[in-house]
């Protein structure tokens, strides 16, 4: 588990002076639920989850999904359209999707053991956020994906998770709270 540095007191004071509340909820939000990054990424892409996978910190975060697509190229085009920017495809598996199925997890999946599991479940494409192979833990994922014939599709950490906080806006508004989703610029170097 990683400890986050405390928020600097001057930032806290500036937020208080402007009556700004901050809500931060990470791993519990990552758990597959109506509010999770995976669920909302699947919804945005128009794919249908049928099973959860990838456990981290005692919660399941990834989804196996049925899609209307038959090829990596078709699915990648849909991802580009939905995310609104270029993506990166590492074609370690076949161009044909197995029965139109894919796996996805917003952000970044750090466990290289999932690629064997995905192939056992008949999946040959995994969409996630961070796929830049120069990061050591990502390099291990590339090796495992290549070994097991699973194509990696990278969409950036932010872009694969942004649909979750966008959905949370609706949740808070339903409670009568004014809130706003503030977009950021995707870090394309994560691809």
Give the location of each predicted region.
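Active-site catalytic microenvironments in core metabolic enzymes, especially phosphate/sugar-handling
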Residues: 1-191
């Amino acid at each position: 588990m990683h400890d986050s540095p405390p928020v600097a007191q001057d930032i806290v004071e500036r937020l208080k002076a402007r009556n700004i509340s901050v809500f931060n909820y990470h791993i519990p939000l990552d758990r597959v639920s109506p509010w999770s990054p995976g669920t909302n990424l699947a919804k945005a892409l128009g794919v249908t989850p049928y099973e959860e996978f990838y456990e981290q910190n005692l919660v399941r975060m990834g989804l196996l999904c049925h899609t209307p697509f038959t090829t990596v190229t078709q699915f990648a085009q849909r991802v580009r359209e939905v995310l609104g920017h270029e993506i990166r495809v590492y074609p370690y598996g076949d161009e044909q999707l197995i029965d139109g199925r894919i796996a996805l997890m917003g952000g970044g999946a750090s466990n290289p053991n999932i690629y064997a599991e995905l192939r056992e479940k008949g999946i040959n494409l995994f969409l996630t956020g961070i796929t830049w192979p120069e990061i050591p833990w990502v390099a291990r994922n590339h090796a495992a994906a290549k070994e097991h014939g699973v194509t990696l599709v990278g969409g950036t950490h932010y872009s694969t998770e942004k649909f979750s906080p966008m959905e949370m806006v609706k949740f808070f508004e339903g409670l009568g709270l004014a809130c706003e989703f503030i977009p950021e610029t995707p870090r394309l170097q994560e691809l």
